[in-house]
Amino acid sequence: MAFLKKSLFLVLFLGIVSLSICEEEKREGEEEEKQEEENEELSEEELRDRRAWLDKLKSLGKVVGKVGLGVVQNYLNPRQ
């Protein structure tokens, strides 16, 4: 009877240990997935920021081009 109790205790102990190891690995996997999602979100935010900067630069380029064109036209065709 004592041998059976010890065997049962050993089986339960090993089962609990393996279960806790599996839970720990599962938590680590979930944390890694969460970090990857955050990195993807950051990448999307960075892309939006870059697009916004490109749009601003494009608008600035248009304004500078118009001003430059006006200066060149005034230089070539001065008003008297």
Swiss-Prot record:
GO terms for cellular component: extracellular region. Keywords: Amphibian defense peptide, Antibiotic, Antimicrobial, Cleavage on pair of basic residues, Secreted, Signal. Expressed by the skin glands. The keyword Ribonucleoprotein does not apply. The keyword Secreted applies. InterPro entries: Frog_antimicrobial_propeptide, FSAP. Residues 23-49 form a propeptide. Residues 1-22 form the signal peptide. It is found in: Secreted. Has antibacterial activity. Belongs to the frog skin active peptide (FSAP) family. Dermaseptin subfamily. This is Raniseptin-4. It comes from Boana raniceps.
